[in-house]
Swiss-Prot record:
It comes from the Bacteria. One of its GO terms (molecular function) is structural constituent of ribosome. GO terms for cellular component: cytosolic small ribosomal subunit. Belongs to the universal ribosomal protein uS17 family. The keyword Ribonucleoprotein applies. Pfam families: Ribosomal_S17 (PF00366). PANTHER family: 40S RIBOSOMAL PROTEIN S11 FAMILY MEMBER, SMALL RIBOSOMAL SUBUNIT PROTEIN US17M. This is Small ribosomal subunit protein uS17. Keywords: Ribonucleoprotein, Ribosomal protein, RNA-binding, rRNA-binding. The gene is rpsQ. The keyword Ribonucleoprotein applies. Part of the 30S ribosomal subunit. Gene3D superfamilies: Nucleic acid-binding proteins.
Amino acid sequence: MSDNNEKQTLRTVEGRVVSNKMDKTVTVLVERQVKHPLYGKYIKRSSKLHAHDADNACNEGDVVRVTEIAPMSKTKNWRVVEIVSRAAV
């Protein structure tokens, strides 16, 4: 079995903040490229995540790094680790 001393690696992704209208929560759009199984062309796929922003520091357009956490609510199980770049005002 696995020891409790081993630290589990947490999933970390980068994305763009598309909404900060909720209190202490931001919506992050994460885009990735996947190869089409038949035609081989790379296509964009995206997903929206709800992330915890304790300081309400993020604004729309910011690029942020988020990491997975234990669920905080029905849809929120990510946390903003850092703001990689600010949006141009």
